Amino acid sequence: MESSAVVPGTTAPLLPYAYAPLPSSADDARENQSSGGVRWRVCAAVLAASALAVLIVVGLLAGGRVDRGPAGGDVASAAVPAVPMEIPRSRGKDFGVSEKASGAYSADGGFPWSNAMLQWQRTGFHFQPEKHYMNDPNGPVYYGGWYHLFYQYNPKGDSWGNIAWAHAVSKDMVNWRHLPLAMVPDQWYDSNGVLTGSITVLPDGQVILLYTGNTDTLAQVQCLATPADPSDPLLREWIKHPANPILYPPPGIGLKDFRDPLTAWFDHSDNTWRTVIGSKDDDGHAGIILSYKTKDFVNYELMPGNMHRGPDGTGMYECIDLYPVGGNSSEMLGGDDSPDVLFVLKESSDDERHDYYALGRFDAAANIWTPIDQELDLGIGLRYDWGKYYASKSFYDQKKNRRIVWAYIGETDSEQADITKGWANLMTIPRTVELDKKTRTNLIQWPVEELDTLRRNSTDLSGITVDAGSVIRLPLHQGAQIDIEASFQLNSSDVDALTEADVSYNCSTSGAAVRGALGPFGLLVLANGRTEQTAVYFYVSKGVDGALQTHFCHDESRSTQAKDVVNRMIGSIVPVLDGETFSVRVLVDHSIVQSFAMGGRITATSRAYPTEAIYAAAGVYLFNNATGATVTAERLVVYEMASADNHIFTNDDL
């Protein structure tokens, strides 16, 4: 039965929940993990309507402090006491996987999170299991009339370990039904984890699941599984092949550097199926991609050379993806040499924990992928997302003829907080991905159209003008579970009047408090005034050649007052073509802020763990921190978002 509660010391209701309340202490959490469930409805708490007011923004963004009382009451009551924190134990390369701990740490002990605070952090419309730890998306596929999502999951705890493949299905990639675990680490060749892999559906309907097994000695091998009943549209049971493991690391490859087989494709040059596996070359510490061919998915031949070797210093390539974009490209790879078709090669950087991609040409017969721009080679140039986004996996959706990409969003708080709240990590919103037809130098990513079905009440505030050095609070009913569409226009006379070049700005070092003639300007979300806020913004400057350059950034530096949280400033330069306004779509879902700027040419994902800007105190502001320009929000529409309907699968769902 759905329950509700009241924030201690206030009259503001908690969001309704359909799972057990959080434990009162970290010790209780370890003994009896809370189930963490899903939120069923959007928050009913209403922000007090406020008149638009112009305020000086410099102090707000630069970190000016004010005496503060509790936001909406004493939300910190019933807090989990701060206790001495141990330095986080690494869960990464020793296990042959990328680092799985955030590293968040405070020598003074963890922040005393209250249950109400932690309850608020759980998202409403992002995918996550009921409880415990999850990471990489695995084997996304459309099969039997269902979208299937498998993912790395620890069924026994809230940090990395005991990794199995969990499984959920959906009709729309928004509302999900949780199924029993698909595979668990029960064989010597995967006893330390059923790691990342992929699913391939053959033309005759056979379903092939390839995955990396982490053996009893922490060596990485490739394994095969098939459905116990291919006629089951839910693919509920899987059989591991008796020939497992089907692939071992070849000579010269480290035992822990051989993982994540890609969805296979059929190559007509020799009538074989191909897959690739990520690895690294210790000579130069460069990422490499190994290619294999097979006719039966049991016996494989290693193809000579590397499909690609990255620049020195790129390190281990994880979670490789390869697919065509542009022209008449579809789900199948065949080395199409049409000039309109480019091939996206993507890797997840084991060293940096970012997802890089590059555009290039692919000669399947020669087993060579070549970037179209060596300066933007794989691992040193373009990223899928400039924030907390990792281990992405795409699939071709035959139902709607589109490519969809998933990734997971890690935590940036402490492991102690994750244990207390009973869960860690979640999935991004699934995104469509395609070539930017205007630039042909980057991809366009956008939330799947099905997400719009969760939009409810809308507030249209288009036409607001924000003077230089000003901030305006938006009169919204709530600011914790929303979808914002905005486009901004700088006053043309202000742009024309600018004569000095500004080439020093950098998202990761400058932030939203650094003022220039034409920025920063944008939105403050999960904001309560002068104490907590996450900035989503543009910064426009003129180069030495007089051309305008635009940065799109997130500034997390003031997103929380908790000290045991990793906060960053993220973003990069984004192309803005003649006649285009500065546009952005921002999805705010409690502790997640995801942005898609310039139609999806650049994306950024932030984790935010506010201590005060929660529930009714979570506001949204327009800001303009430029010194010499007026900004107009030509379009500004804010949608309240309902929560997704996620629950354990029952026969009523058929």
Swiss-Prot record:
Accumulates at the base of growing leaves. Its main location: other. The active site is at 136. Gene3D superfamilies: Exo-inulinase, domain 1, Glycosyl hydrolase domain, family 43. InterPro entries: Beta-fructofuranosidase_N (IPR021792), ConA-like_dom_sf (IPR013320), Fructan_Metab_Enzymes (IPR050551), Glyco_hydro_32 (IPR001362), Glyco_hydro_32_AS (IPR018053), Glyco_hydro_32_C (IPR013189), Glyco_hydro_32_N (IPR013148), Glyco_hydro_beta-prop_sf (IPR023296). Transferase involved in fructan biosynthesis that catalyzes the production of 1-kestose (fructose and nystose to a lower extent) from sucrose. Also exhibits some hydrolase activity toward 1-kestose, thus producing fructose and sucrose. A weak fructosyltransferase activity leads to the formation of nystose from 1-kestose. This is Sucrose:sucrose 1-fructosyltransferase. It comes from Festuca arundinacea (Tall fescue). The lineage of its organism: Eukaryota, Viridiplantae, Streptophyta, Embryophyta, Tracheophyta. The gene is 1-SST.
